[in-house]
Swiss-Prot record:
Pfam families: tRNA_edit
The name this protein goes by in its record: Prolyl-tRNA editing protein ProX
Gene3D superfamilies named in the record: YbaK/aminoacyl-tRNA synthetase-associated domain (3.90.960.10)
Job of this protein: Functions in trans to edit the amino acid moiety from incorrectly charged Ala-tRNA(Pro). Has weak activity on correctly charged tRNA(Ala), tRNA(Gly) as well as tRNA(Cys), tRNA(Met), tRNA(Pro), tRNA(Ser) and tRNA(Leu).
GO cellular component terms given for this protein: cytoplasm
Organism, as annotated: Acetoanaerobium sticklandii (strain ATCC 12662 / DSM 519 / JCM 1433 / CCUG 9281 / NCIMB 10654 / HF) (Clostridium sticklandii)
Record keywords: Cytoplasm
Gene Ontology MF: a single term: aminoacyl-tRNA deacylase activity
Stored InterPro entries: ProX/PRXD1, YbaK/aa-tRNA-synt-asso_dom_sf, YbaK/aa-tRNA-synth-assoc-dom
Localization per record: Cytoplasm
Length: 164
């Protein structure tokens, strides 16, 4: 069954009995564009960085509050990685089957071998609302941090919540 990216995410949310709100909107590619959309939960938007280590052997999906500053050098020390850099679009497609502008924690659902480690901003822990793309930048899903974590666990990816 060939579902589009958004429908696959919605199906997984329903399968795991997760409460969420789906908001449809024009495609957005940046946090700035996202903030211009008239949605109630604009304060709960997260940004997502897809990173790789120096040798390209380990990949990380960093999920942080949209206003959180992230220093890659500090982050690499905190997660015990070699030099971090942004992964290429080819790697993004290979591991998460996503394109630039649609990066999302739900990308782990496409990581069939659960190779990508998810690093959550500790400031997200306990939030009742987190707003993320459902692997499609023309919609936003609002759900709790706990439920977002449940998705990552269900896929088998390792994850941690650290202070960024």
């Amino acid at each position: 069954m060939d579902m589009d990216a958004k429908q696959a995410v919605i199906a997984k949310l329903d399968e795991l009995k997760i409460n969420y709100t789906l908001i449809e909107h024009d495609p957005v590619y940046t946090i700035e564009e996202m903030e211009k959309i008239d949605i109630e939960n604009v304060d709960y938007i997260v940004k997502n960085l897809f990173l790789r280590d120096a040798k390209g052997r380990q990949h990380y999906l960093v999920v942080a509050d949209k206003d959180q500053k992230i220093d890659l050098k500090t982050l690499q020390d905190k997660i015990g990685s070699t030099k971090l850099s942004f992964a290429s679009e080819d790697r993004l497609q290979k591991y998460l089957k996503l394109t630039k502008g649609a990066v999302s924690p739900f990308g782990v659902l496409n990581d069939e071998t659960a190779e990508v480690e998810v690093v959550f901003d500790k400031n997200l822990v306990g939030r009742s609302c987190v707003a993320v793309h459902p692997n499609d930048n023309s919609a936003t899903v609002v759900l709790s941090y706990e439920d977002l974590e449940k998705i990552v666990k269900a896929n088998g990816n390792t994850f941690k919540a650290i202070e960024l």
